Structures are given as C-alpha cells and as structure tokens.
Amino acid sequence: MKAEETSPEDILKLKFKTDLGLGARANIGMIVLSSDQTLELEFRTLLNFEGVALYHARIPNQMHITEKTLAKMETELPITASLLPDSFNFDVIGYGCTSGTTVIGEDHVTKAIRTAHPGIIVTNPLTACKAAFRALRVKRIAFLTPYEPSITKAMRNNLIEEGFEVPLTASFYESDDFVVGRITPNSILESVKKIGVRDDCDGVFVSCTNLRAASIIEPAEKYLGKPVTSSNHSLAWHLLRLAGILDNSENLGRLFNQVI
C-alpha cells in the first residue's frame, strides 16, 4: 500500500499510562552560559537523586569575560528563561553564572527570570554560596576565582557586605572563558590547599561555574579539615533544598549533609 493510501484504521491503536515523569520529586530548570563547558557534567553527579530532573537552556554570552560583557546577559535572561516550558512545572530555576549575578545583581536576575516564569523560586551561585556558608556556619572565607581583578573585587565586596570576612582572595587572572573551562582540577585543588590552609579562614569558596571544582571538594576538605564549596557545588545544593529535596550524600562534601 502506498503511503498516501494509509489511513488511521491501518494502525493499531494501543493503550498507555502516564506517570509523574523523570521529575517525580522535583523539576529543576537551569540557564547555562553558552560558553560553559562544565556545569552540565558536574550537575549529572551533584543532582543525581531519585526523582530529580534537570532541564536547561543556554543563554548567549561572549567568551571574553568582562563586567561589560556580563552585563549584556540581563536582557537575554527573560528570553532564555522562556525556553524552559511552563508545562514542566518547575520547582526552581537557577542562573548559572556567579560573575554575571555579581554584575547584574541578584534581585535583577530573579526579576528577569520571573518575567517568563512569574512567582518561580530563583537562585544563582552567588546567592547559593552565601546560603551554603551560613548553613555550614562559616564566616571567614578564603576566596578563589579565575576572573580579572575588577570582577573578583566586586564579588569579594558583595560577600563582605553580606557579613562575611574574606581574609584572602586569589585568582587565576583569566578572562577567556574557554581557557577557564580547561583549567585542570588538580590546579584548582592545589590552589585551594594553598589558600585554605591559613588559620584565619574557616572555609574556601571556588567561584565560577566553568571551573571543574566539584571533584576536588572531598579531597580538599580532607586535606584542610574545613568546608570547601564551589559555584556549581553550592548551586546544586541550593537548588535541591529549595525544591524540597533534603536527601543527604556521603560523597559530595560536608555541604550536602546540611539543610538551609
């Protein structure tokens, strides 16, 4: 029989059932930078809990990271957020850029995303890291970034304004986001050890979702004897907790045994 002669009566109609889908417990939406090489891979581990689903959309950004290029993302946020379908019933949506949040502003990020998803719970790595350190009862932070000085200083000032102490700040001084994604985990680990060993800090924060830091959290904590977190690490934890997922994990560092 030719294709044009096919009719519905020629196809056996079968019954089916539906369930709550992959996100039976939580549906998490993420806005990921187009230049990011790392976030999705690390989130596969950090959000690997039964009934938790992750859906992401990529936001246009420039590979060269400056305050000016970061600020341009504010107008793109509502457009990118609209690519995450309302029908998925998201519990929370995250914006995956620590430096971008610093430049644009946490409240502005939330407002932009809520343009597409009114009333949705929103978080980002900057908000998440502060929530993480409060949950861990860490006030004095050793701070590592890959950024140029102006961005690093702006982020440090934000932490200080929120009541944290930042006795030591260090950076890789790299503004090319492609290169940032290629910085080795061992380079990050050795840097965390170097800055975190000081007695005047209670924990370490590794900023930037493009740095491959999730895998070094546990060895760094074991070496230093104090909490360590990163942009992706704290953001994943915050997304889970805001979505009502309170599961603990024995292999994701101290933070994943904390509630908000």
PLM region spans:
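C-terminal functional extensions of proteins
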Residues: 229-260
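N-terminal glycine-rich anion-binding loop in soluble enzyme alpha/beta folds
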Residues: 2-80, 149-152, 156-184
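Periplasmic-binding protein-like
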Residues: 90-96, 142-144, 201-208
